Amino acid sequence: MEGLLTRCRTLSALATCSLRHSRCIVRKCYHCAPGRGQRLVVSRMFQPQNLREDQVLSLEGRASDLTCKSQRLMLQVGLILPASPGCYHLMPYTVRAVEKLVRVIDQEMQAIGGQKINMPSLSPAELWRATGRWDLMGRELLRLKDRHGKEYCLGPTHEEAVTALVASQKKLSYKQLPLLLYQVTRKFRDEPRPRFGLLRGREFYMKDMYTFDSSSEAAQETYSLVCDAYCRLFDRLGLRWMKARADVGSIGGTMSHEFQLPVDIGEDRLVVCPSCHFSANTEIVDLSQKICPDCQGPLTETKGIEVGHTFYLGTKYSSIFNAHFTNAHGESLLAEMGCYGLGVTRILAAAIEVLSTEDCIRWPSLLAPYQVCIIPPKKGSKEAAATEIVERLYDDVTEALPQLRGEVLLDDRTHLTIGNRLKDANKLGYPFVIIASKRALEDPAHFEVWSQNTGEVVFLTKEGVMELLTGVHVV
């Protein structure tokens, strides 16, 4: 028995030692300071880079030049990687930006009463045949059959599915209206010529909202409500936008507007009135007139990227699927509908397109994957003595400013010069880059702080850095 107890004590001691050793390994691997949280470091980020143009073209499956700034920059810094024509892998930085954009969208949609749902991407052919869009959509619709021969499509939009869903609720009351249902999911479209990276792909993320109202007047009020939410969204992102009258296209309805970001590579042609701010897609305007229909002033032409689209549908879909509600008098009436889309990945790429320089990505501040990058001195340099000071700064920032936890990266690639790491940070567009250069050895230490969105460079003490970062807003 005594021998057994001795062996148990030995095993316990070995286990404790092993556990301590593993903790040391983890701490070293993740750059953890004793008693501190895990530090996020650049060296551990999965970020394929430096693809040659011929590699990119081979991955995309077509021989054409990279003709779009956002596409070129996102490929160069490893934000996206082509999987097949029109389909991209989104790398960790990009996923973080998309998630932040979705949070902003959620805030705006839920502020007006939106309820988030999730509908299947596979949509039965009979729903689309009921509206005639199985044939109307033509080759853009990605179609498939299951093992039983049943036909489906990968939904580019969900008017049929959501109307059938609401119609299945036989006791829908006027008291539940307006009903605003939305989702953020992957959509699919068999683009004949996918190009411009995330701006025109075959698979993309989209926010689509569908509204159900008790009357035409109420539906148009809801239409205005959602449009106003879109305006606030783009204002929060710091983007210059236009709300342009547009064609209803294959979705149908009686009224439609596009939200456009003016930019030269845009594929949509728009006319704008400088006097009354009327704007419209040229698809619905007689260009030979060149006169504003609202104020009779002259129209100018520009190009834009469509990032949002709204439709007043009336009873186009509710009449087909019998989506009724019961009014205050017990009568069964057709719901008046609207649908509203936001291209999530397209907004991200379009924002990079309009905000970035030719060489460096610039994000809407709310969407930057990480808000701060801290660059310690190069190993073996004269400033290397400041390494501990800058690591302590990282810990102090993330502990004292809770909103920045998970938002600060430490560029631990100390085999590289500060200049090389600053160049990488500029390309990736962190809103703030903090460098431990020569003045970090002063008493008190001063850090070189780059504000990427303003171009300002200042030297601040730790207290100054903390005060500056206190004002950073994170979603």
UniProtKB/Swiss-Prot annotation:
UniProt-listed SUPFAM superfamilies: Class II aaRS ABD-related, Class II aaRS and biotin synthetases
Cellular component GO terms, alphabetical: mitochondrial matrix; mitochondrion
Catalytic activity: tRNA(Pro) + L-proline + ATP = L-prolyl-tRNA(Pro) + AMP + diphosphate
PROSITE patterns per record: AA_TRNA_LIGASE_II (PS50862)
EC code: 6.1.1.15
Transit peptide region: 1-29
Stated family: Belongs to the class-II aminoacyl-tRNA synthetase family.
The protein's name: Probable proline--tRNA ligase, mitochondrial
Gene assigned in the entry: Pars2
